[in-house]
Design a protein with these regions (language model features):
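Conserved CoA-thioester-binding segment of acyl-CoA-metabolizing enzymes
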Residues: 1-61, 95
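Terminal low-complexity tails and localization/encapsulation signals of metabolic enzymes
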Residues: 2-5, 250-263
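Glycine- (often His-adjacent) and acidic-residue-rich active-site loop
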Residues: 49, 59-96, 112
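CoA-thioester-processing core
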Residues: 93-98, 107, 113-166, 180, ...
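C-terminal long alpha-helix characteristic of the crotonase
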Residues: 127-132, 183-230, 237-243, 259-263
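Acidic, divalent-metal-coordinating active-site segment for phosphoryl/phosphodiester hydrolysis
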Residues: 169-176
């Protein structure tokens, strides 16, 4: 269980009926290590038990929403005994976030990449500033998306376009992501002002009815998302053993283009 896990890498602020969870690793562009994953689950479960909170905002401190999984954690978890607990933690985070009995908003500034993008897709609404860059870029290091990305992308795009986004691994501008239907809103001016406008609009609505609709859809989709998370976990294990993945990691560290061979 991750309840009562304490870390300075995740901040929680509550203002009336709105809670804001902030990833606090600006020096790594809010990369997601095990402490952050556990901290996010802890804060979300704490919020889920509050009858006073209706809206949860997920954001990152500094210049990025989240650059994705921490590459140092990835390199240190070559052993499956370390890998599977991390993947289970990711699954717990995504299931908790997706089924949270609150209205959830991702406020994206800067990069939302890899697992960071998957996490944003698990929320009900994504608002991004015009300078944001969003990427499902696992393929660049010979991996598959995780964090339920196969589920969320197919829901938003359909199977054909979801596969294309995954296979391309392209960095998308906010405009491109909006055109595809991956995000719901681009802040025309200040992100915080646009976020507050969205929050105030929702607070003026019957939020309990909105949350009930969310609960029904989340419960209906729960078995499918759980299955996707399981398939991603074991699929990722296989990809970690490939020559292409090891080449992708080396190329990333050496800041060069990878030479993939399909093995």
């Amino acid at each position: 269980m991750t309840i009562n896990f304490v870390t300075e890498k995740v901040n929680l602020r509550v203002n009336g009926r709105v809670a804001t969870i902030e990833i606090n690793r600006p020096e790594t562009l809010n990369a997601l290590d095990t402490d952050v994953l556990k901290g996010l689950v802890c804060k979300l479960k704490e919020i889920s038990e509050s009858d006073e909170i209706d809206i949860v905002v997920l954001t990152g401190k500094g210049k990025a929403f989240s650059s994705g999984g921490d590459i140092k954690t990835m390199l240190s978890n070559r052993d499956d005994r370390n890998f599977f607990p991390v993947m289970d933690c990711i699954s717990e985070l995504i299931m908790t976030l997706y089924s949270l009995p609150k209205l959830t908003i991702s406020a994206v500034s800067g990069a939302a990449a890899g697992l960071g993008f998957s996490m944003a897709l698990a929320t009900d609404y994504i608002i991004a500033d015009k300078t944001s860059k969003l990427a499902m870029n696992f393929v660049g290091i010979g991996l598959i998306p995780d964090g339920g990305a196969h589920f969320f992308l197919e829901k938003r795009l359909g199977e054909t376009r979801a596969k294309q986004v995954i296979w391309d691994g392209k960095m998308l501008s906010a405009d491109e992501a909006f055109e595809l239907g991956l995000i719901q809103e681009i802040a025309e001016g200040d992100l915080q002002q646009a976020l507050e406008a969205r929050i105030n609009d929702w607070l003026s609505r019957p939020t309990q009815a909105m949350i009930k609709t969310k609960k029904i859809m989340a419960e209906k989709n729960r078995p499918q998302l759980l299955k996707v998370l399981e398939l991603e976990k074991y699929g990722q294990q296989k990809m970690r053993e490939t020559i292409d993945h090891h080449e992708g990691i080396r190329a990333f560290i050496e800041k060069r283009k990878p030479n993939f061979i399909g093995k």
